[in-house]
Amino acid sequence: MRYNRLLLQLIVLISLFAACRKQWSATEEDMANYGWSLYEQGDYVTSYEWFSNAIIEDKNFQDGYNGLGWTFGKLVELDSAVQTFAIGLSKPPNERIATNVSQEILAGLTFAHSALKKDSSVILYGDSLIWLINQQIGEKTWTFTHDSTTNYLDVYVTLALSYYALSDYEESVANIQAVKTALNPASPPYIVNTTTVRGREELAAEIEYLQNFLRGR
């Protein structure tokens, strides 16, 4: 009798364990988190698959579109990156995710449009991101969660390049000044005479210098 009772208890426990295992499945957050791990390791082809699965699981999961957009950027699928980021920007934030995903999407849109030479769009999204950063309480900075070498200074330099391309030299200089001040608060004002060819050449050289400097950090 005692043996039968123990056997019955064992069967019940095994059944419960099996049922729990069947009920568990990866959530969209699990998929995206693994996608980001792969992204950080440089495995962009596989990260693409995991981010794609995340948004199949939940078509409103903003960070899935964020990850997929950045992955498309790494795969040099720039039009796809822009389209994916744009969809992600329209999705609601997930309150369980501490990262400001909208800021990461705006940065992604800024860089993708820059690579596509769409300067007006660079300014639209880049200025929007800088505005949001400046509304923050405390430190007015932004760093990409999944690559700390990419931050708000890259956004400023990208904006400087696009403003230069559109012949808005005053705004280009202002963005260069923002970078210089962030790197060294004691740096003197950046002054260049952009009414002359030589002055514009100096500004272009400064933009290129800062781009290379920030890449090499």
Q: Can you annotate each of these PLM segments?
A:
Residues 26-53, 57:
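Alpha-helical segment of the N-proximal tetratricopeptide repeat
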Residues 64, 97-98, 105, 139, ...:
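TPR alpha-solenoid repeat register
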Residues 150, 157, 161, 165-217:
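Terminal, low-structured helical/coil segments at or just beyond the last alpha-helical repeat
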